[in-house]
Amino acid sequence: IIYQIDTALFYDLNGDGCGDIAGIAAKLRYIRRMGATVIWITPFYLTPFLDEGYDVSDHLQVDPRFGKLNDIIAFIEQARELGMQVIIELLIQHTSDAHPWFQQARRNPQSPYRDYYLWSDTDDDDTPPMFPGVEKSIWTWDDEAGQYYRHMFYHHEPDLNLASPAVLKEIENIIIFWLKLGVSGFRLDAASHLTKQAGRGDEKRGL
C-alpha cells in the first residue's frame, strides 16, 4: 500500500505554519498501523515555492521550510525500521528559473549551462501551454539571454534539455545522491513530456 503525503500540508511539528519532514517522521507509526508499506512524499527540495515546490532551485538541498538533510535521513531510517520504504518526486522536466543552472545559462551564451535549457530566436510555435489561462505561449523572452526559452508549464519553470548528455549526467547524479541516502524509488513527474522532449523527436537521442 502506497501512502502519499503532501509534505507542506501533512503535519507541522515546529509550528511555523508549514508541514515538515520531522512532522511526517512523528506520524510514522500511525501511518504504518493504517497498513502502508510505502510512503510517497511530495517535493521538499530547495524552491521559491511558486508551484507548490515543483519549481526546484536545487535538487540536492532540502528547503528550510521543510527541515534539513539530516531530517530526511532520519525519516528514511525510521521508516525502514518500521518496515516501510520511501519514494520521492524526481523533477527533471524543468527547474525553477532561480536555479543556478538557468542563471548561468541566461548570462552567457558560451556557458556550458546554456545547453541545459531550450532556447530559440523566435517564439513561432503553436504548441499550447499546459495552463493556457495563465501562460500565452510555451516560449518566454529573456532580456539577459537575448533569446526565448521554452517552458511547457509556467514561465518561471524553464524546460531542461533532455537531449543534452550533460543534463542526463546531472539527472544521474541526482538519482544516485538520493538512493545513497536510502530512498527506495522515485515518482517521475511530468513523464509524458519527458519522452516528447528528449532528443526533440529523435528516438536515438535523449532520455
Which stretches of residues belong to each language-model region?
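Active-site and adjacent substrate-binding regions of carbohydrate-active enzymes
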Residues: 1-207
